[in-house]
Amino acid sequence: MNFKYIVAVSILIASAYARREENNIQSLSQRDVLEEESLREIRGIGASILSAGKSALKGFAKGLAEHFANGKRTAEDHEMMKRLEAAVRDLDSLEHPEEASEKETRGFNQEEKEKRIIGPVLGLVGSALGGLLKKIG
């Protein structure tokens, strides 16, 4: 009779352990789903902010291009315009997606392009504004 109780208690303990493990797994998968949803929301917000920034930057670059096109350019102005044109081309390439099968690669490449573009473009914008302020002042 003691053997039956030992077996019954062992089965109860094993089933309780199995239920607890199953609940832990479900809890982890629910957390993963919530984290993934949060990341998607953050990426969506970041993409919209980046898109607005790209549009503003492209408008600014085009305005600078028109300003420099109407006047005489020095070699420094010419070099700055070349860099701005390259930055605008890179920004345009970010907006045109490739094939759907290359989606993951495109995401990685887009992040790399954004990293490569943002630093130099901010420097160019700063130097362009500084140059304009010098000419105006």
UniProtKB/Swiss-Prot annotation:
Q: Which Pfam families match?
A: Bombinin
Q: Spell out which residues are annotated as carrying Asparagine amide.
A: N70
Residues bearing the modification Isoleucine amide: I136
Its subcellular locations are:
Secreted
Q: Which domain of life is it from?
A: Eukaryota
Region called Disordered, residue ranges: 92-112
For biological process, the GO terms are:
defense response to bacterium; killing of cells of another organism
On whether Secreted is a keyword of this UniProt record, the answer is yes
Q: Does the keyword ATP-binding apply?
A: no
Any one GO CC term of this protein is:
extracellular region
Q: Identify the tissues in which this protein is expressed.
A: Expressed by the skin glands.
Q: What does this protein do?
A: Bombinin-like peptide 2 has antimicrobial activity, but no hemolytic activity. Preliminary evidence indicates that this peptide does not lyse and thus kill the bacteria by its antimicrobial activity.
Protein family: Belongs to the bombinin family.
- What is this protein's record name? Bombinin-like peptides 2
Which species is this UniProt entry from?
Bombina variegata
Q: What is the lineage of its organism?
A: Eukaryota, Metazoa, Chordata, Craniata, Vertebrata
